[in-house]
């Protein structure tokens, strides 16, 4: 019985991995590839190839090689989390080579690199819903294949989370604009501030185009689910970073800011609040600092800039004053417990009184959701969390030409 339960637990915890093995006969977590760093790269970029080209001083060729698998070499040179370095063979000697740094050096030295020529026109048309990394990547390679591509996005500008989720201090907007313009130069048509279901229906897209690729991203916020979350001064990370992406900078001058969360988005909000004039910024996280999902360099950067990391404290409630404005965030101290499925100690409530954290602004940065409900009425099925169900990772079941 115990053995059977272990198998069941594994099937539940690693459902996607088992499904990938059964359906596609491959292992996404396999580290036995001939080139481990390439195996860890989500885009499968030829890392040894472009590193060798950088070594030879062929910077433009290095950029061209990266583009074979990833049309955003500049973006990744600035903001990639570089998982490839975890599997760099140099770790067996002393430490990984600075792969992302070499990519950054290549794109800086290469300057403007001409895009490859598109294949002969096929006469096929494709609509891409969403102008973020996924949508623009699909548009790029479809255009190279000779298809006519049109991108629709609900925001003022293209870029998705690269623009509306990552602050400009990490990725300068002029660099993002240049890279997007380079992609569009392949003849890709783009329409911004177009919302599907309002300005144009999904059915109209299906009728107008030979294929539709849905790449809507995760642009809705998630609630903490605590008392007082509707107080004035409580903002979501999605809202705050989205406003910053549009150039609408909030004024935190002299204010006390509390950020809830421990991921990269929480660090982006924390460090942005410091830059926006906050008098004091506290990042409240229910686990230990070493359990944060944010990159260590981002956490260390936030601390170096004067932010406080209040760990092992779970948000309990938000206190509002008589006018309904945020006055404080209450947090319950935690102690570490058993290891969870992700390999991190599970936080448990400590037998001590809650802590009151004075605050004028509370930023909720605990993840994003997917606004896929607009597509469900048109036959796109979703699973928990709003993720669209697809076959072979892309094709939408029972809808021809929809991916």
Regions found by a protein language model. Give the residues of each.
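Ferredoxin-type iron-sulfur electron-transfer modules and their immediate structural context
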Residues: 1-125, 173, 212-230, 320-326, ...
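N-terminal Rossmann-like FAD-binding beta1-loop-alpha1 element of flavoenzymes
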Residues: 124-150, 266-274
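Rossmann-like dinucleotide-binding cores of NAD(P)H-dependent redox enzymes
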Residues: 148-151, 155-186, 190, 242, ...
